[in-house]
Amino acid sequence: IAFAWDYLTKVVELPQDRLVITVFEGAEGLPADDEAAAIWKKVTGFGDERILRLGMADNFWSMGDTGPCGPCSEIHFFHGNDPDISRFGEEPRIDGLGWTEIWNLVFMQYDRAEKGGSLEALPAPSIDTGMGLERLAAVVQGVTSNYDIDLLRELVELTATIAGKKYTGSTSDDDVSMRVVADHARTTAMLMAEGVMPEKQKREYVLRRVMRRAIRHGHRLGIERPFLHEVALRVVE
């Protein structure tokens, strides 16, 4: 908890008044995560109004129906001019304004051996921490969409140029297709750099499907010539 807070507020220098913490409120047979809440209060100086308690759906993480699991604690950032805690829990607006999760700390302390079975304490509990790198980049760069960060926006704009269209950052069919092409071109470049080629089996088939979907969305944009290699080359550059 202290490491996460130190990184976000001192290294990245995010304003603390735009951050809110969530912890597990407890459920039947599972205690509330009072320990995490107490540590957050000590580390941040926040009161209860900025350390929110949520249930299983939001603040209890598991790998699936079985396996390691445990309560989690999330850090959320507010996109917009006036951080409004009363809006917490709402989906961000179409323009991206609102609260968005940027960090999750999972306290792995239980194991579920069978689907629907009881939870047993893990002999060696651990902490699984996950931060959304592109979400954090969006926060730092002052944009509300991952596709508007410098690494992806250039690919989106290149796709728009090839298609002879304008990217507006909306949820229109054209803009969605441009984002798909940008994302999938990057995936294609990264996989091929690792030696994966489009084939008919295993991970090679996954790459083939990714490329096929990118090309399909290019066709939806009216692109009738080969184009995916151009966007992938920009990733390499």
Task: Give a label for each model feature.
Residues 236-237:
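Short, intrinsically disordered, charge-balanced linker/junction segments flanking boundaries
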